[in-house]
Every structure is written in C-alpha cells, then in structure tokens.
Amino acid sequence: MAKILIPSRNRPGSLRSVLGYLAHFYPKSEVIVADGSNEEYRLGYEETIKSVKDTLSVEHRVYDAEFPFFDRILDALNSISDELVIMGADDDYPVMSTMKRGEAFLQKNPDFSTAMGSIIHFKLNKDEALSVRLGHAKNLGNPVARTRAMVFSHFPFSTTYAVTRREHLIERYQRANETFLANFFDFVVGLHDCTAGKLKAFPTVGYFCTRNYKHSYLRADDQLIYLRRADEVLRLVDIMKDDLVNYGGLSDSEAKKVSVRLIRRRISHLADKQPFNIPGFSSHPTFKNSKIVQKQYKEFHGLFIDGHPSRLEHLDTIEYIVSELKSQASQTRDNLGEKASYETFQEQVVSRKGK
C-alpha cells in the first residue's frame, strides 16, 4: 500500500488523532511525518509517534521551523522510492479502502495522474456547532487536456487529498512557491493535475477533512484578494498558459486565451457564487452529466439516514473523528497563540519569529 505523507506544523494533538485513527482502523499503514514545528512542540510530536509505534510504521522527519513548507514536502517525497504516494494532513483522515482502489487503478492506467474519492468536510465552530459538507470529485478522462481543464473549471474540486504519482507531486511542489495564492491554490493544483494527466474519481468517500476553530490556517484575508494581489493572479495565468502549451499542445496565443478564461471563471466563483450555490445547478449538465458526482451526493445524504449502507459503513469512523475534533477544541495546545489565519507563508514565519 502507498505511504501516507503528512506535513505538520505545531499540531501534535491533531496528529495524534489522525495517527490514532490509522492505528485503529488501518493498522500497519506506513506514514511519513514532515514536521516543521517550533521547538516547544518537539516533545509532543515524539510522544505522539511513540504512542503508535507498535501499530503503524511512522517515519518522523524533523525540519527547522523556518524551513519552507513546500521544501519540506519535496524533501520527504525525494526520500520515497515508491511510484505512488497518498497526500495527507495532520487534521485529515484518509479512507484507505478508496486509496487502495486508486492505487490499483493508477498502476494499470499510466495516463492518469491522480485518483481520489469524495471528501467529507467537518468544521467545528466557536459555538461548538458542527457543520458538514461534501467535497465532490469528478472523472476527467477526456483525451484532450484543454477539454479536461475547461470541464474542471466549471465545477472545480480539491485534488490534493488523493493517491498521486510521486513524480507528478514533485513537479507540483517544485513550482508551488510560484503557484501558491490563497483562494486559488487548490484551483491551480487541480488544473495542473488534469492538464498533465487524467483524473480518476470514485463514488466512495476518499477523505474526511476537519477544521477546528482553535487551529491556524492559510486563507485569504478577504474575498477581494484577486484585486489586492492582481500581479500574482496574472502570474498564475502565465503558468496555466505554459501548462496548456507543454501538456496540451496548444499554441501560445490559444493557450493564453484559454488560461484567461480559466482564471476568469475562478474569479467569478469568488466574486459571486460557487457553482453548487447557483439556483438550478442540480439540473445543469455540469452536475447531471456526472454519474460519479451524483452517487457521491447520494452517499453523503445517506450518512444522515438510519440504516443507510453509507451510514453503517462510516458511522464508527465519523463518531471517532467528531469526538477527537471536539476534544482538540477543549484540550489542545496546538497552534497556541497563533492567529486564526494567515494569507501567506511569509506572514506565518514572521509570526513565529515574533514569539
């Protein structure tokens, strides 16, 4: 089975929950933790990893707190000899049965870059209210890279939490310092994934992702980031154009036109409404023509129906995750003293130095 790569920073408590989940539900999983935490968190990480040493194979790679995030990931990827890697996070929980399906599929289909299931997002708010939403994933198997990119842009989704070819991940993170922009990164990563190769989606859940009001995240200060950081948005247009030339065989002029259309679509989603919030979306071809996405929504709705196969399959997992999420909020010292969010990695590093 492919190794799970988990970059982590100042969250030993959250990581303990994820590793505990893997130890309980998927013993013998192989995990690499790329730890870039501050010194005061080191002991917590050592204790966390020691707690699962008899059940999981965990390689703990420790980096200086100022060592850049994407460089940590690259260093860890370069230590792996396997063809396929599962990307994870210290607050997200993979469904390994879906990851195993993805691994088997990619081994037989070299023209696909990544494989994934849907994502169930849990968000714990300050009032202790828990919200849940579905993050869909679509099959993008058209032989034309330009078509895959255009279809993706209509109804984009996260492609990070998946099983992916290691060489493709290395390319992703080698250029990540150029492509990272809050509110745009998942979009640009997804376009790169579906331009460089095809995407495989399964109707089953691939990941349970969590957000905790006590944690610190990278996100835009406001929805007008595309105006405040317009130069960076234009840089993304050029990067997408180059991908369409290199992977899609388009001319420079045609690739530029397409990349402008792609970025305009992303901005329209930020400025107005996400596709699934637009009235009548459920009858739009973007949704209706994807049987996989419709199955994912049915599975998601089934989680809330007693006796539904989806609920029976995932109930123990969900109860564990929700319990850990609430426990972290009441007891954790993860990200202690940090802002709720930072717009850039530079701001995050400066904040550390200020302590």
Predicted regions and their residues:
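A short, conserved alpha-helix in the catalytic core of glycosyltransferases
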Residues: 168-172, 180-203
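Short, acidic, metal-binding catalytic loop of nucleotide-sugar glycosyltransferases
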Residues: 20-29
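Short, flexible, basic/aromatic active-site loop/helix in glycosyltransferases
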Residues: 134-154
